[in-house]
């Protein structure tokens, strides 16, 4: 997959940042020495950390050069590092690991969360949010279109049914032995979008990438045409012509 596009991602900045705000509201730290925003993207979530704890050392890490470029432009006084969290080790004196919408992309992420929580000092916090929407029409339709067109072989890996997130109890059992307190909850957002085309624009910034990036321009256009038609059928218009994008998310806050 090509590099992430910060411009595409930020088309829905307010909606994408809201889960970060909701996650941050449950972090019970008054004065962390160091906080790391894992999967910082274009810096919208990092900015929330800076605003809440202006005296703390705030670090953002991401694998995307384009996302990091935008983050550095947005917050020139902060430190941003290109790193893969699967191989990354938290620096000393880190009191908060904050991860908004990143670990759903990380293989064996339960094991990674255990490793990272174990690296925190006593009282440190691991705060994680992940989309839990693979069974939503927005994602089911991606796989259906991938299976139904001339791109079937090209998209075989992308179209393979992905594992949904583990049940909440799996996170509890994995993390509770490593911490003194843990909170786990789901929130279902109903984002008000202009029309069904806006849903397509939303997922083009994230979940649709593995499906459209491997295609040639002509095939990509046809894939998006078919996907858009199916999305229009799956998401009825409201009385004012807008649509509601149902978006479940899982939250975990563990205090070591």
Swiss-Prot record:
GO molecular function, one term: trans-aconitate 2-methyltransferase activity
Subcellular location(s) per record: Cytoplasm
E.C. designation(s): 2.1.1.144
Origin superkingdom: Bacteria
Keywords: Cytoplasm, Methyltransferase, S-adenosyl-L-methionine, Transferase
Catalytic activity annotation: trans-aconitate + S-adenosyl-L-methionine = (E)-3-(methoxycarbonyl)pent-2-enedioate + S-adenosyl-L-homocysteine
Gene3D superfamilies according to UniProt: S-adenosyl-L-methionine-dependent methyltransferases (1.10.150.290), Vaccinia Virus protein VP39 (3.40.50.150)
CDD domains given in the database record: AdoMet_MTases
GO BP: methylation
Function comment: Catalyzes the S-adenosylmethionine monomethyl esterification of trans-aconitate.
PANTHER family linked to this entry: TRANS-ACONITATE 2-METHYLTRANSFERASE, TRANS-ACONITATE 2-METHYLTRANSFERASE-RELATED
Protein name: Trans-aconitate 2-methyltransferase
The UniProt record lists the keyword Phosphoprotein: no
GO cellular component term, pick one: cytoplasm
Family: Belongs to the methyltransferase superfamily. Tam family.
HAMAP family documented for this protein: Tran_acon_Me_trans
Gene name tied to this protein: tam
SUPFAM superfamilies for the chain: S-adenosyl-L-methionine-dependent methyltransferases (SSF53335)
């Amino acid at each position: 997959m090509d590099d992430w596009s910060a411009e595409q991602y930020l088309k829905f900045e307010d909606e994408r940042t809201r889960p970060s705000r909701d996650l941050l509201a449950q972090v019970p730290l008054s004065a962390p020495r160091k906080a790391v925003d894992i999967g910082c993207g274009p810096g919208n979530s990092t900015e929330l950390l800076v605003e809440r704890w202006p005296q703390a050392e705030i670090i953002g890490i991401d694998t995307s050069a384009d996302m990091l470029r935008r983050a550095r432009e947005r917050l020139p006084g902060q430190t941003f590092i290109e790193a893969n969290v699967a191989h990354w080790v938290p620096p000393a004196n880190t009191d908060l690991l904050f991860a908004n919408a990143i670990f759903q992309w990380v293989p064996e992420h339960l094991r990674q969360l255990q490793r990272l929580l174990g690296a925190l000092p006593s009282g440190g916090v691991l705060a994680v949010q992940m989309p839990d929407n693979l069974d939503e029409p927005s994602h089911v339709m991606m796989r259906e279109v991938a299976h139904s067109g001339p791109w079937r072989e090209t998209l075989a890996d992308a179209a393979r049914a992905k594992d949904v997130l583990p049940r909440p109890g799996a996170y509890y059992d994995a993390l509770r032995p490593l911490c003194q307190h843990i909170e786990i909850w789901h929130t279902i957002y109903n984002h008000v979008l202009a029309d069904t085309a806006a849903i397509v624009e939303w997922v083009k910034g994230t979940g649709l990438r593995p499906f459209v990036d491997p295609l040639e321009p002509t095939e990509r256009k046809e894939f998006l045409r078919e996907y858009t038609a199916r999305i229009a059928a799956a998401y009825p218009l409201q009385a004012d012509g807008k649509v509601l994008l149902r978006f479940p998310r899982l939250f975990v806050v563990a205090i070591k």
